[in-house]
Amino acid sequence: MERIKELRNLMSQSRTREILTKTTVDHMAIIKKYTSGRQEKNPALRMKWMMAMKYPITADKRITEMIPERNEQGQTLWSKMNDAGSDRVMVSPLAVTWWNRNGPMTNTVHYPKIYKTYFERVERLKHGTFGPVHFRNQVKIRRRVDINPGHADLSAKEAQDVIMEVVFPNEVGARILTSESQLTITKEKKEELQDCKISPLMVAYMLERELVRKTRFLPVAGGTSSVYIEVLHLTQGTCWEQMYTPGGEVRNDDVDQSLIIAARNIVRRAAVSADPLASLLEMCHSTQIGGIRMVDILRQNPTEEQAVDICKAAMGLRISSSFSFGGFTFKRTSGSSVKREEEVLTGNLQTLKIRVHEGYEEFTMVGRRATAILRKATRRLIQLIVSGRDEQSIAEAIIVAMVFSQEDCMIKAVRGDLNFVNRANQRLNPMHQLLRHFQKDAKVLFQNWGVEPIDNVMGMIGILPDMTPSIEMSMRGVRVSKMGVDEYSSMERVVVSIDRFLRVRDQRGNVLLSPEEVSETQGTEKLTITYSSSMMWEINGPESVLVNTYQWIIRNWETVKIQWSQNPTMLYNKMEFEPFQSLVPKAIRGQYSGFVRTLFQQMRDVLGTFDTAQIIKLLPFAAAPPKQSRMQFSSFTVNVRGSGMRILVRGNSPVFNYNKATKRLTVLGKDAGTLTEDPDEGTAGVESAVLRGFLILGKEDRRYGPALSINELSNLAKGEKANVLIGQGDVVLVMKRKRDSSILTDSQTATKRIRMAIN
């Protein structure tokens, strides 16, 4: 009541009324701004004002039992007054100091695990080396970069499920952990974080950093892998750069790098096979990178590179809508065109059929070492503004743009015939023919292009046909700029289609990518790439083909053996024997094949001539299309170790050495595996194994289906008949006995019956 009286008294004085109405505080908007909502509007001011009070902090009541009322200096740490509107107590900032000095120690074992990404960053910086600072103009271009080293590659949704499962396992809500990486991470984290006292929210934040790739669109000159981006602020400014070598690598950068190498190898190999698309898919599905299936990585990893995008397109995944030509990524920024076939004549009077883009268009071109802006009309380059690291890189960009412009003077600059072929020996399309031609030598192209006087524009200079800079003249329409062109920032992905020859098109039918665009650069992968597909055996050279082929036969011997006797043609056509053919001299391949096939036929016809080691050894030679000839061979030549080495038709050699006693095969001194099967040289063991409990009825009878191996016989029902392959490579018809009592006599009658059945 007293208060209200006092206020009424104040209000009756005219001066009070004037102050309250004339000053701006009565603006409802301002009052609202500072009083509505929970969000603090001026945190700095609030903090200063709060800290000026004696007890600015509130704490749980239990704190009064854990902290003394006064510290050693006799200062009060908490007030006996309750916080208005809650049952908490008011505490002095000095209480925090006391707690930090004298409070209970907590277990720190979980800190390095939770804050793993920070601890690892400190280690990388500790071991990194900073070099000299150079002052020079920095050509920075904005690229989408990974800013978070050391992460797994889960999608936001996958990570959310993992985090919920680890941090809040008892919360309700459907969580489906499907991918291998999700399950592994969840198990690992649950074990690591047992009895963890750090707040669940903090744990969730830190897990997110570890599981999800975070990207930003940042200006970069130099390394773009995440271990360089984390120190971007230390290594490059507007006019300076500091050399830096990271003090450690992170798995996500290694995955990106190894994925690009694997994809390039696979696309290059698929392009030369009979059915490129089927081969590519087979290889992607059977390849592992650092122990993880390549297809899983492709689904999660956002790396954009030509070969990687071709693999993604083959798997039906969306990719970026930009297209690739001459190793540059083109993105149309304005204009449009229609395509029309046109025949043009080169300087050598060769006719080329090109698809002409009619209409005005503008593009950005982004390469590894140069970038450009291109404006063009129908078969005419209007303007090209290039920036690049060095003369060579700038020249590359100019050549690509000139070819892409389809100008007549470019086509007339061709000297000699265009007959470039791809790895599969097929002619390249005309645009790539032109590109390859001028990439080899662009002198005539630049000379014929023409020059023009130029205006003095800030940040731009001219470039002459011999690639020297100039401020007076420049090649027509071409300028060099100090500023780079930013990479296309959008993360948009489009649905694409891919044809059998690995050409990727958007839904309008424009070709975005083709195998010609895949870089030939060879690198060494950081993570182990395991190609299980036979198509990739040759990647490590001829020796690897030899060893892998024989390993494959030994691993699959049971089925190979049956096919050898039943359906040899199908066996000879197996794709696993394809790589081997490149080791056999072309001129004699057919004769070797004819010879081996005849030899094998004799083995099938004549009892007791079946020889496991010899079949394994000669089988790959039978895969080539056979030529009939009377030639007899005692040895075959294979091209390995840079020269011809010999495989003996009968007997061992350094190339192929089979030890009958241990059943171990060594190829070129490398272990190629051990044969696990019944000894088929002596017949006794085989017969008892085959025939115990079976009655031999006579010769093979095709009505009872293909021959079974010994191991498959056990599945027969009593009284059931089947053909079976016995040790010598012969096939006989047997019946499973109806009674078990007569098993003993089987082995004795077996030998007689087999001889009768076969003869």
From Swiss-Prot:
GO terms for molecular function: RNA binding; RNA-directed RNA polymerase activity. The keyword Oxidoreductase does not apply. One of its GO terms (cellular component) is host cell nucleus. A motif (Nuclear localization signal) lies at residues 736-739. The keyword Secreted does not apply. The record marks K627 as: Mammalian adaptation. One of its GO terms (biological process) is cap snatching. It is found in: Virion; Host nucleus; Host mitochondrion. Pfam families: Flu_PB2_1st (PF20947), Flu_PB2_2nd (PF20948), Flu_PB2_3rd (PF20949), Flu_PB2_4th (PF20950), Flu_PB2_5th (PF00604), Flu_PB2_6th (PF20951), Flu_PB2_7th (PF20952). Keywords: Cap snatching, Eukaryotic host gene expression shutoff by virus, Eukaryotic host transcription shutoff by virus, Host gene expression shutoff by virus, Host mitochondrion, Host nucleus, Host-virus interaction, Inhibition of host innate immune response by virus, Inhibition of host MAVS by virus, Inhibition of host RLR pathway by virus, Inhibition of host RNA polymerase II by virus, mRNA capping, mRNA processing, Viral immunoevasion, Viral transcription, Virion. InterPro entries: Flu_PB2_2nd, Flu_PB2_6th, Flu_PB2_C, Flu_PB2_CAP-bd, Flu_PB2_middle, Flu_PB2_N, INV_PB2, PB2_helical. Plays an essential role in transcription initiation and cap-stealing mechanism, in which cellular capped pre-mRNAs are used to generate primers for viral transcription. Recognizes and binds the 7-methylguanosine-containing cap of the target pre-RNA which is subsequently cleaved after 10-13 nucleotides by the viral protein PA. Plays a role in the initiation of the viral genome replication and modulates the activity of the ribonucleoprotein (RNP) complex. Belongs to the influenza viruses PB2 family. Influenza RNA polymerase is composed of three subunits: PB1, PB2 and PA. Interacts (via N-terminus) with PB1 (via C-terminus). Interacts with nucleoprotein NP (via N-terminus). Interacts (via N-terminus) with host MAVS (via N-terminus); this interaction inhibits host innate immune response. This is Polymerase basic protein 2. It comes from Influenza A virus (strain A/Henry/1936 H1N1).
